Swiss-Prot record:
It is a single-pass type I membrane protein. Keywords: Host membrane, Membrane, Signal, Transmembrane, Transmembrane helix. It is found in: Host membrane. This is Uncharacterized protein ORF95. Its main location: host cell. Residues 23-52 are extracellular. Residues 70-95 are cytoplasmic. The keyword Transmembrane helix applies. It comes from Acidianus bottle-shaped virus (isolate Italy/Pozzuoli) (ABV). One of its GO terms (cellular component) is host cell membrane. The keyword Transmembrane helix applies.
Length: 95
């Protein structure tokens, strides 16, 4: 069940990024200033990173539930990813 669920989530995430990348050039022509263009690109890149980290955390959480390994959530890697996700979200909100 988990591999199918993971495939669906990954497919949706990739579709989202393809749509946003398709719209990005149109947004860049609207901004007209190099500084605003750079900020827009940085925010898009950061959004991709945040969404990817969120997906990894979701898979890790679901994986630990289905494989009965609750220690997975306590690993150093997932703690670091969660901390990075929170700091990136704080940055996006402050912009």
């Amino acid at each position: 069940m988990l591999p199918g669920f993971t495939m669906i989530i990954t497919s949706l995430l990739l579709t989202f990024f393809r749509e946003v990348e398709h719209l990005l050039p149109e947004c860049l022509t609207i901004t007209n200033t190099p500084q605003r263009t750079l900020v827009l690109i940085q925010r898009f890149t950061l959004l991709q990173k945040v969404m990817t980290i969120h997906l990894l955390l979701s898979i890790g959480t679901l994986g630990s539930l289905f494989t009965l390994h609750p220690q997975l959530l306590k690993t150093n890697l997932l703690q670091k990813l969660h901390k990075e996700l929170n700091s990136n979200l704080d940055y996006l909100i402050s912009c």
